[in-house]
UniProtKB/Swiss-Prot annotation:
Belongs to the peptidase C54 family. GO terms for biological process: aggrephagy; autophagosome assembly; mitophagy; piecemeal microautophagy of the nucleus; protein processing; protein targeting to membrane; protein transport. It is an enzyme of class 3 (hydrolase). This is Probable cysteine protease atg4. The gene is atg4. Cysteine protease that plays a key role in cytoplasm to vacuole transport (Cvt) and autophagy by mediating both proteolytic activation and delipidation of ATG8. Required for selective autophagic degradation of the nucleus (nucleophagy) as well as for mitophagy which contributes to regulate mitochondrial quantity and quality by eliminating the mitochondria to a basal level to fulfill cellular energy requirements and preventing excess ROS production. The protease activity is required for proteolytic activation of ATG8: cleaves the C-terminal amino acid of ATG8 to reveal a C-terminal glycine. It comes from Aspergillus clavatus (strain ATCC 1007 / CBS 513.65 / DSM 816 / NCTC 3887 / NRRL 1 / QM 1276 / 107). It is found in: Cytoplasm; Nucleus; Preautophagosomal structure.
Length: 400
């Protein structure tokens, strides 16, 4: 009997149920991580970008070209394809199970059955539970990509540097930002274990810790500890090196902008967060799941979906580099979007601050934003804020 290509039929079903969106808002500009693509298909794109070594901002315009069959500008699709997209993986080095996890109520039934029947020695796939980790990895990877190659980088250049960066996220225990490292830190410090769904708060704490473990002078991480408050004195301490130089700093705002859905009063500020030149996207924000949001069009947000299981890299040695085919699995031109009213309110919002001038620019934009602010900038931490730890992680685990 001939084998049946189940994957082919699954792709057909997914296409029928989730067709690629068309540009049905031709009069609305399109945004992708701070870059604006105008509504006309032949026009200009604008970007607020670092125009000098001191970080002074100036506006630059670049002509756009033709649109594709769904009427999206090709330059916009090139931008989307150049973002790093990290998804579920399978057949990686097992992540050991904790000895007392046999009946863990935080684990979904599907994940529990899979762990008993297929991954009895440990988790060799994160399908069904790792989507928030993957979204967080995507956010961190794109922040690092911007620092390494610049916001204007597009696929087809600097392939060696891109592959080296991606290898830091490979699915083996030695990779500094692997899912193994996330799970290890989550178990030790965040009360999150293999097979459990991580929330935005735990993901932010893992990112901060894993970056700190590298001891790099190229990136630091500021997290808001489950509030929307950012303190200038605390940020300055984190972002300043011993010799006084500014170290690029990733700001992670873990927040909840409503109860079941994002409160409409926050819509404008949430969309503007993805329009800022410092934006590196949003992780979370989808009921019972997590996605990596990178763009805005009208009331819709574009996202990269981590819920696609791919084989882990065969290159497990820390000194290996990924092949061209493996690098391709970290990119897609396939657009997906969701109306802002359908977003889950629990999310992790990221901004990369590259210089003191960048900080001043970002702060000015935040303070002058529309609608209810999703970030509050205060001069110093004078109060002992004790946010409820569980609030930011109360998103139902994905069961698939």
């Amino acid at each position: 009997m001939n084998s049946v290509d189940i994957g082919r039929y699954k792709r057909i079903i997914n296409y029928l149920w989730d067709p690629e969106p068309r540009n049905d808002l031709p009069d609305e500009p399109i945004w992708c991580l701070g870059i604006r693509y105008p509504p006309n298909h032949r026009g200009w794109k604008t970007q607020d970008q670092d125009g000098s070594a001191q970080g002074q901002y100036e506006q630059k315009t670049i002509p756009t070209e033709k649109a594709n069959e769904h009427q999206w500008p090709e330059e916009f699709l090139d931008d989307v394809e150049s973002r790093i997209w990290i998804t579920y993986r399978s057949n990686f080095t097992p992540i050991p199970k904790p000895p007392n996890q046999e009946a863990n109520p935080a684990m979904t039934l599907t994940v529990h059955l899979r762990s008993q029947l297929m991954d009895s020695q440990g988790f060799t796939s994160d399908t069904g539970w790792g989507c928030m980790i993957r979204s967080g990895q995507s956010l961190l990877a794109n922040a690092m990509l911007i620092l390494l190659l610049g916001r204007d980088w597009r696929r087809g250049t600097e392939a060696g540097k891109e592959a080296q960066l991606l290898h830091q996220f490979a699915d083996h225990p030695e990779a500094p930002f692997s899912i193994h490292r996330f799970v290890q830190h989550g178990a030790e410090f965040c009360n999150k274990y293999p097979g459990e769904w991580f929330g935005p708060s735990a993901t932010a704490r893992c990112i901060q810790a894993l970056v700190a473990q590298q001891g790099s002078s190229e990136l630091r991480v500021y997290i808001t500890d489950d509030t929307a408050d950012i303190y200038e004195d605390k940020f300055a301490r984190i972002a300043q090196a011993e010799h006084g130089d500014f170290i690029p700093t990733l700001i992670l705002v873990g927040t909840r902008l409503g109860i079941d859905h994002v409160t409409p009063a926050y819509w404008d500020a949430l969309k503007e967060a993805l329009q800022l030149p410092q934006s590196v996207g949003i992780a979370g924000g989808r009921p019972s799941a997590s996605h990596y949001f990178i763009g805005v069009h009208g009331q819709y947000l574009f996202y990269l979906d981590p819920h696609h299981t791919r084989p882990a890299s065969l290159h497990q040695d820390v000194n290996d580099t990924l092949t061209h085919e493996e690098v391709n699995t970290y990119h897609t031109r396939r657009l997906r979007r969701i109306h802002i009213k359908d977003m889950d309110p629990s999310m992790l919002i990221g901004f990369i601050i590259r210089s003191r001038e960048d900080w001043t620019d970002w702060k000015t934009r935040i303070l002058s934003g529309r609608g209810n602010s999703i970030v509050h900038i205060l001069s110093e931490d004078t109060a002992n804020h004790q946010a409820r730890k569980e609030a930011i992680d109360e998103v139902e685990a994905l069961d698939d």
